[in-house]
């Protein structure tokens, strides 16, 4: 047989490698089924539930399926199973409900709104080990509630409303190890409740427990206890709680998770029970007497059975428990310790203590998960639940916090009380950002640098009691935005700066008792949410309400006892304030020190008349309405500021003064703005069309003003014989060139200078005669009512020098009566303009009048006239005032002479002139004035012999085009006719 060649061997080797690599690759890409996944479901599931197999157990998930009764689950399972029935609607568990589910090892009934469990409801569940009843509405555990659960090891009933537990409720649960009853309403635990059980974990947080007695209660718990939680209960720290304190000193220090915080009495509120001495809790008895009276056994003299009494005694050993580890650091290099004895494992192979709502539980560790770094000379305790470290450095003789080396990791609580620390610097807490409690009490601290606690953002409790601090400033508390409890009692504090606590918005408790305070500054408590305040044993004579006590909106308790209150008028606001809060909120008495007649009397029992007699004098002046801030003997303040009271002659608070000034300022601004808007609107608003009576009234005003102007001018210029008719003053001289704006005549003066508006003597005589003759002359047939400002055209109308007839002149009163009569009889309210484009441009206006009845060439051609008292009144040739072309129109036909309202004639047809009359402008332009005078000359110069051949129309139009830049009322009258 031939041996294979080297080439064949190499080929075979390559093939083997290829096969091997292929096998490895195939193994990587092909999943290997796990034992758990390979298990087949050999049990039927129940619709609509979901089933699976985990860890050799059958899991049946029936959460949120709407079940109202256990009997609705009709399936039977022969193998051990876990049943999940969370978030259903089972209000009650009936007797023998679980008989067909006898193989269940865990049942979760959480969040079902359960209200009652009938006797024997759990019959048949002999192998059940875990029962979850959390988040229901159970209010009682009776002696027969848990019958049939002999194998139960874990019971979770948190977040219910349990108020009563009967003493035999757990007597049949001999294997119970974990009991979770947190967040219920349990006020007291009955005697011998835990006699038949051996608990390792007990959670009683968030109930209403005030005390736990030793006999029949604590003596049954401590036999195998590994973890105890008692937080968030209103513990009453008096003589009775000494039993609990003494018992806590006999169990491992780390077995207690959290603090036991005192609720009452008030001077212990917020303090840890373990930090209070027994002599303070019960000052009348010694420790041995207290223990003897309460039946607490003395510690055994044998070292083997002695438990450490306080953290400082645990100096030579390391204790490993279910939830914490204690480690002591010494000056020497620590030697390796022996492996501690492992605690007796729990009865179940699984973990026993899950979270509040999570069924799976991790097993407890017996070794610290991380290395412990503890400062030299201190004792450290590590809690497994949050990996927080408690550093105990009490009574170690430290002079500075910087001596704490090495710095611990994740320290939660740091106790440095009873040392020799004098100053606190900003750099002292550079590696303590995780602290939630810092105890610096009973040192010699007199200086705290601003921002010293800025590196402690998570700090919730700060103890600075029993030091030498004299002043509190806002900078001291910078960075303490999470602080809840602050203790400053037994210092020498004399001064608190304004807004000292404003940087601590979450502050709930503040102790300032036993200091040297005499007053509190403004805004001392602004920005805080204080619920408890202790001001006991200071030197307060009174406390201001405004700016101080008024900020205590969330106050629950306040201690004001042992202060030298001065019961005078200054105390009235304070008295009113303490009467408005609940009587339960004020701890103790508020006794007067002065004056002598009120010594040792409670401020709340003194009437206001006795406290402040001056108030009687203030209240006597009578029935004036109550003003804000007033106090009355039988009542409180009458305003929303119930504590703003100033004694007689006292100064007005600055805040009230500033507020009043602001109110006045804004009121003045709004009033001024309103007036400005009103005036502006009035200026811009156009006058509406008016009635005939309003036109007459306006005309009367203008006429009277013109008459006054005539008489004033006549008086100034004099008259012949002293009785001459007053004449209008001569027109003003034109201003010199370059000063065209220096003289601006008033429009009324210019208007009255126009001869067409001057009253004629014949008209005055006729009006006087009409007034004398009475109603007969006015109302007889054939008579015409006197027109209001009749338009008279004729040679006599334009005479520049009227006739001297003293009998025709009347007083101003007579003229006013005449104008009033004319107003009442006025019938006309419209005017039409004269047409300038007539076929005979060379005819003058006067010529047209001369030819009434047949002349048609002038501007007034076609008008017929009516002579009355020597005057001429024009009538249209047809229509209302006679025949001919219309110059004057009326609303309805009347044979009376036509009269024209003067004001409406001027302003009714030209809005711009009306606006000029209402708001005279500041100036007038010379060209407009000259144009108006030129028109006046052209229109009314007939009396001076002006004829049509002297000024042809073309020259007039050229001259007017040169002088006039804006239309005036005469131009408008010449071109357009309006009816209004």
Curated annotation (Swiss-Prot):
InterPro entries: Cys-rich_flank_reg_C, Leu-rich_rpt, Leu-rich_rpt_typical-subtyp, LRR_dom_sf. Residues 30-655 are extracellular. Pfam families: LRR_8. Residues 326-361, 622-644, 709-735, 762-785 are annotated as: Disordered. Broadly expressed in embryonic brain with highest expression in cortical plate, pyramidal cell layer of the hippocampus, thalamus and hypothalamus. Residues 677-980 are cytoplasmic. It is found in: Membrane. Residues 715-725 have a biased composition (Gly residues). Residues 233-284, 563-614 form the LRRCT domain. The keyword Repeat applies. It is a single-pass type I membrane protein. Residues 365-407 form the LRRNT domain. One of its GO terms (cellular component) is GABA-ergic synapse. Its main location: membrane. Glycans are attached at residues 69, 597. The chain crosses the membrane at residues 656-676. LRR repeats lie at residues 79-100, 103-124, 127-148, 151-172, 175-196, 198-219, 410-431, 434-455, 458-479, 482-503, 506-527, 529-550. Coiled coil: none annotated. Residues 1-27 form the signal peptide. GO terms for biological process: axonogenesis; gephyrin clustering involved in postsynaptic density assembly; neurotransmitter-gated ion channel clustering; positive regulation of synapse assembly; postsynaptic density assembly; regulation of presynapse assembly; synaptic membrane adhesion; synaptic transmission, GABAergic. Suppresses neurite outgrowth. PANTHER family: SLIT AND NTRK-LIKE PROTEIN 3, SLIT AND NTRK-LIKE PROTEIN 4-RELATED. This is SLIT and NTRK-like protein 3. It comes from Mus musculus (Mouse).
């Amino acid at each position: 047989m031939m041996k294979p060649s080297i080439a064949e061997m190499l080929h075979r080797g390559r093939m083997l490698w290829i096969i091997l690599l292929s096998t490895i690759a195939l193994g990587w890409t092909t999943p290997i089924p796990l034992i758990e996944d390979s298990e087949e479901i050999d049990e039927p599931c129940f619709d609509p539930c979901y089933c699976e197999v985990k860890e050799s157990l059958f899991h049946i998930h029936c959460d949120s399926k709407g079940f109202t009764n256990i009997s609705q689950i009709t399936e039977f399972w022969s193998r051990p199973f876990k049943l999940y029935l969370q978030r259903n609607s089972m209000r009650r568990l009936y007797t023998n409900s679980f008989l067909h589910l006898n193989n269940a090892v865990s049942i979760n009934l959480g969040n079902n709104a359960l209200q009652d469990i009938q006797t024997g409801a759990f019959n048949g569940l002999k192998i059940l080990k875990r029962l979850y009843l959390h988040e229901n509405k159970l209010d009682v555990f009776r002696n027969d509630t848990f019958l049939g659960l002999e194998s139960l090891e874990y019971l979770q009933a948190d977040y219910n409303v349990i108020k009563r537990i009967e003493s035999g409720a757990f007597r049949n649960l001999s294997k119970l190890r974990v009991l979770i009853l947190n967040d219920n309403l349990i006020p007291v635990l009955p005697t011998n409740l835990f006699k038949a059980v051996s608990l390792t974990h007990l959670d009683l947080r968030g109930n209403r427990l005030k005390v736990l007695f030793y006999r029949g209660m604590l003596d049954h718990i401590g036999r195998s206890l590994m973890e105890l939680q008692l937080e968030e209960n209103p513990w009453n720290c008096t003589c009775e709680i000494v039993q609990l304190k003494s018992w806590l000193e006999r169990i491992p220090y780390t077995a207690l998770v959290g603090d036991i915080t005192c609720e009452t009495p008030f001077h212990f509120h917020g303090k840890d029970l373990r930090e209070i001495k027994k002599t303070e809790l019960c000052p009348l008895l010694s420790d041995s007497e207290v223990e003897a009276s309460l039946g607490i056994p003395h510690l055994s003299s044998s070292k083997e059975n002695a438990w450490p009494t306080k953290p400082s005694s645990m100096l030579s050993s390391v204790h490993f428990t279910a939830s914490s580890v204690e480690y002591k650091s010494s000056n020497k290099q620590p030697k390796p310790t022996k492996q501690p004895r492992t605690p007796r494992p729990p009865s179940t192979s699984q973990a026993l203590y899950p979270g509040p709502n999570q069924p799976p539980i991790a097993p407890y560790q017996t070794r610290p998960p991380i290395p412990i770094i503890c400062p030299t000379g201190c004792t450290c305790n590590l809690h497994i639940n949050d990996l927080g470290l408690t550093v105990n450095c009490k009574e170690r003789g430290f002079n500075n916090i910087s001596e704490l080396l090495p710095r611990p990791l994740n320290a939660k609580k740091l106790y440095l009380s009873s040392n020799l620390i004098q100053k606190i610097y900003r750099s002292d807490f550079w590696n303590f950002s995780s602290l939630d409690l810092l105890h610096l009490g009973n040192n010699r601290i007199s200086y705290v640098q601003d921002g010293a606690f800025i590196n402690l953002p998570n700090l919730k409790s700060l103890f600075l009691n029993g030091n030498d601090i004299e002043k509190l400033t806002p900078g001291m508390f910078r960075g303490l935005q999470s602080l809840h409890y602050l203790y400053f009692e037994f210092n020498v504090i004399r001064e608190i700066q304004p807004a000292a606590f404003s940087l601590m918005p979450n502050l709930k408790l503040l102790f300032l008792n036993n200091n040297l305070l005499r007053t509190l500054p403004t805004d001392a408590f602004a920005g805080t949410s204080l619920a408890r305040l202790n001001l006991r044993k200071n030197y307060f004579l009174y406390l201001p309400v405004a700016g101080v006590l008024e900020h205590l909106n969330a106050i629950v308790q306040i201690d004001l006892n042992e202060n030298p209150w001065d019961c005078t008028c200054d105390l009235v606001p304070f008295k009113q304030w303490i009467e408005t809060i609940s009587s339960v909120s004020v701890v103790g008495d508020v006794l007067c020190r002065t004056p002598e007649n009120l010594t040792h009397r409670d401020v709340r029992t003194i009437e206001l008349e006795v406290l402040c007699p001056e108030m009687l004098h203030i209240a006597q002046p009578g029935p004036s309405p109550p003003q804000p801030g007033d106090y009355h003997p039988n009542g409180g303040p009458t305003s929303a500021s119930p504590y703003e009271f100033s004694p007689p002659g006292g100064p007005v608070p600055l805040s009230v003064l500033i507020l009043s000034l602001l109110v006045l300022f804004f009121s003045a601004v709004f009033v001024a703005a309103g007036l400005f808007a009103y005036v502006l609107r009035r200026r811009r608003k156009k006058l509406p069309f008016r009635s005939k009576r309003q036109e007459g009234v306006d005309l009367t005003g203008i006429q009277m003003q013109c008459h006054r102007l005539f008489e004033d001018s006549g008086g100034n210029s004099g008259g012949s014989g002293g009785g001459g008719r007053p004449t209008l003053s001569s027109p003003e001289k034109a201003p010199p060139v370059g000063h065209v704006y220096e003289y601006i005549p008033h429009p009324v003066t210019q208007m009255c200078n126009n001869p067409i508006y001057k009253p004629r003597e014949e008209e005055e005589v006729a009006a006087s005669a009409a007034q004398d003759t009475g109603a007969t002359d006015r109302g007889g047939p054939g008579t015409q009512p006197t027109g209001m400002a009749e338009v008279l055209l004729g040679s006599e109308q334009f005479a520049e020098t009227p006739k001297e007839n003293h009998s025709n002149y009347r007083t101003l009163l007579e003229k006013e009566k005449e104008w009033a009569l004319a107003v009442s009889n006025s019938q006309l309210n419209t005017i039409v303009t004269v047409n300038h484009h007539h076929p005979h441009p060379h005819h003058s206006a006067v010529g047209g009048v001369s030819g009434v009845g047949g002349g048609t060439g002038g501007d007034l051609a076609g008008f017929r006239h009516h002579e009355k008292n020597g005057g001429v009144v024009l009538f249209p040739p047809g229509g209302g005032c006679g025949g001919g072309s219309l110059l004057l129109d009326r609303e309805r036909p009347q044979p009376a002479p036509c009269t024209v309202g003067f004001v409406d004639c001027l302003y009714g047809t030209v809005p711009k002139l009306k606006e000029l009359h209402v708001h005279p402008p500041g100036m007038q332009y010379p060209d407009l004035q000259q144009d108006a005078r030129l028109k006046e000359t052209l229109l009314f110069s007939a009396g001076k012999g002006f004829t049509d051949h002297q000024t042809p129309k073309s020259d007039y139009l050229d001259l007017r085009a040169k002088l006039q830049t804006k239309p005036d009322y005469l131009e408008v009258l010449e071109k357009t006719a309006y009816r209004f």
